């Protein structure tokens, strides 16, 4: 399986990498949050742009991205607009969503974009090609905050992302029971052992699914999300606790 290298970070080997999400509503908050995050122990900075109020002003969005890049130049920057239908803060049209991601790519400030699988097949394929032409990696994602589908469906979605040339397929699902967590872990393992030719990221959310955020190295998930301050999804734990557990499991 090939790895993915962003800056000096190699994703897909060793302990799972820690991603943290920064959720700021304006330029002032971006500045203050960035300074606070700079001291934290993590590997990838995700900017959750759906929390940003001034989305219609592309210049403001790019100015905020520039602050993040300058404050943490060594950290890979993942640009993510999470749609309302997949648990995000704002609803925008598909056209606006694609345009926003293209503007981020054009800026030269971001290393990776998050692209939702169910945006539309043609738009997804075109945006992946556009990102790759500008040396930007694509995390292709799917989120369900209500349920966990069968393992076969989880694997089918991850394989579809892979067929669309995502650099890193990602899926996050809500368990309704402990057995749902096992379904997610079993699907992750089967994907990793039988189909994946690149790193994948999977997680089961909420308190029930916490084990999935810790056991990625065992089952085949290459990264996990931790919280510096406010969690961006149910079940996230602090980056310090997360690093401790990931290191223990890696060294065992």
UniProtKB/Swiss-Prot annotation:
It is an enzyme of class 4 (lyase). The keyword Iron-sulfur does not apply. Homodimer. Pathway: Metabolic intermediate biosynthesis; chorismate biosynthesis; chorismate from D-erythrose 4-phosphate and phosphoenolpyruvate: step 3/7. 3-dehydroquinate binds at residues 21, 46-48, 82, 213, 232, 236. The keyword NAD does not apply. GO terms for biological process: 3,4-dihydroxybenzoate biosynthetic process; amino acid biosynthetic process; aromatic amino acid family biosynthetic process; chorismate biosynthetic process. Keywords: Amino-acid biosynthesis, Aromatic amino acid biosynthesis, Lyase, Schiff base. It catalyses: 3-dehydroquinate = 3-dehydroshikimate + H2O. GO terms for molecular function: 3-dehydroquinate dehydratase activity. The gene is aroD. This is 3-dehydroquinate dehydratase. Involved in the third step of the chorismate pathway, which leads to the biosynthesis of aromatic amino acids. Catalyzes the cis-dehydration of 3-dehydroquinate (DHQ) and introduces the first double bond of the aromatic ring to yield 3-dehydroshikimate.
